[in-house]
């Protein structure tokens, strides 16, 4: 049974957006979290290229655990980019310098992405940030930093979680995976404990 026409069209739009983002790179990278958006990009992207899934986080974090399960279940090529307190604070300090107009909370969403960019500096890095969950400012900052965000260029960036879920299930994602709850990037990577903001802006050292 075919999916609703809008889901079929959405998947085709995602395929085109990924092709543009990959830009002919033979081994692009996906900043992977195990969330719905990154699962959808992984499902589409690996059919079109030799996709590597890099997950940045603290050992034992939700994102790393989900990525390892995805590797076992779907045979994704998963690599871990380990983070610790010192690494997180170094990256956060750099983001403060590069993006002074963002709030501390907004910059915290970019820490795992910056970690993946630093691990894979010479190839296209994709991520699943969406306009619905993340502010326009965060998306623009991520793209200025070098991350490619295919879902921001589909449906004007206003892609709902339900649309992503329906598309992923249409492509074969099991229902149990489709029920994964949303995690913020800092929560999923397990780095929120290292990021403390005074008045919502300044990074404090523990």
Where are these regions (language model features)?
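Mid-to-C-terminal catalytic subdomains of enzymes
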Residues: 125-206
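ATP-dependent adenylation/pyrophosphate-handling site
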Residues: 6, 24-74
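Glycine-rich phosphate-binding loop signature in dinucleotide/nucleotide-binding domains
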Residues: 24-25, 119-122
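RNA-binding accessory domains that recognize and position tRNA/RNA substrates
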Residues: 1-27, 47-49, 170
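Beta-sheet entry/capping signal
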Residues: 52, 122-126
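Soluble or luminal CAZymes and related metallo-dependent hydrolases
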Residues: 10-14, 104-112, 159-163
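ATP-dependent adenylate-handling ligase core
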Residues: 59-117, 129-155
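Structural preference for long, well-ordered alpha-helical segments in enzyme cores
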Residues: 14-18, 36, 40-45, 70, ...
């Amino acid at each position: 049974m075919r999916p609703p026409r809008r889901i079929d069209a959405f998947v085709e739009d995602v395929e085109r957006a990924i092709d543009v983002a990959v830009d002919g790179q033979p081994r692009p990278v996906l900043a992977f979290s195990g969330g719905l958006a990154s699962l959808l990009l992984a499902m589409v992207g690996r059919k079109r290229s030799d996709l590597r899934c890099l997950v940045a986080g603290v050992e034992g974090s939700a994102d790393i655990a989900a990525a390892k399960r995805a590797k076992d279940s779907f045979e994704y090529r998963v690599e871990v980019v380990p983070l610790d307190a010192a690494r997180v604070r170094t990256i956060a300090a750099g983001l403060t310098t590069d993006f002074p107009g963002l709030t501390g909370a907004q910059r915290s969403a970019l820490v795992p992405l910056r970690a993946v960019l630093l691990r894979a500096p010479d190839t296209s890095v994709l991520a699943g940030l969406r306009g619905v969950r993340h502010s326009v400012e965060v998306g623009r900052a991520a793209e200025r930093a070098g991350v490619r965000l295919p879902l921001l260029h589909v449906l004007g960036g206003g892609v709902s979680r339900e649309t992503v879920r329906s598309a992923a299930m249409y492509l074969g994602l099991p229902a149990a995976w489709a029920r994964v709850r949303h995690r913020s990037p800092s929560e999923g990577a397990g780095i929120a404990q290292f990021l403390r903001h005074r008045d919502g802006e300044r990074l404090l050292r523990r």
